[in-house]
């Protein structure tokens, strides 16, 4: 039904991320070092239905973006994308990875822990955003390997 593969087209993924509620500028390069990206496409026609990116921020591995089109959620695509990012972090010698979660429950099921903001590296602009604490309540999370 679908396949996940590496991609160098971060720009294409930004549109998917934006369309699925991530606060990212569509069509813009990342401000950080993009380590690797993955796309999930349908086998039938190659339509882009999911994606993820792994970046280096403040010297740490960060799962920067993960998104799956609404109608394909529940098929474990997000889980598989997270596994790719975690495997790549470990392959590169990373002892942990970080993320900023809009849906922390998804990540806790995958073994990620919520971390107090003061204990986390500076990996996000969320806490200076005008939406923070109003209609957006992100959590910084970490997974040790």
Where are the regions a protein language model picked out?
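C-terminal "cap" of GNAT-fold acetyltransferases
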Residues: 120-145
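Conserved active-site alpha-helix within GNAT-family acetyltransferase domains
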Residues: 101-127
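A short helix-loop-beta-strand connector motif used in the catalytic cores of GNAT acetyltransferases and
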Residues: 25, 29-40, 62, 135-137
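Conserved acetyl-CoA-binding loop-helix of GNAT-fold acetyltransferases
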Residues: 68, 74-87, 98-99
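Conserved beta-strand in the GNAT
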Residues: 46-55, 60-67
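Short amphipathic alpha-helix that is part of the acyltransferase structural core
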Residues: 1-27, 41-42, 47, 138-140, ...
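Internal catalytic or translocation cores that form aromatic/hydrophobic pockets or channels
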Residues: 92-95, 100
């Amino acid at each position: 039904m679908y396949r996940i593969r590496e991609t160098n087209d971060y720009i294409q993924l930004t549109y998917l991320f934006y369309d699925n509620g991530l606060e990212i500028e569509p069509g813009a390069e990342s401000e950080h070092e993009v380590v690797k990206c993955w796309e999930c496409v349908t086998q039938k026609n190659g339509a882009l239905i999911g994606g993820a990116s792994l970046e280096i921020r403040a010297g740490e591995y960060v799962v920067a973006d993960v998104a799956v089109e609404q109608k394909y959620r529940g098929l474990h695509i997000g889980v598989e994308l997270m596994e790719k990012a975690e495997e790549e972090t470990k392959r590169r010698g990373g002892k942990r990875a970080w993320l900023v979660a809009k849906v922390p429950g998804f990540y806790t099921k995958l073994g990620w822990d919520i971390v107090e903001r003061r204990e986390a590296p500076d990996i996000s602009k969320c806490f200076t955003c005008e939406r923070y604490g109003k209609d957006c309540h992100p959590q910084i999370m970490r997974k040790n390997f």
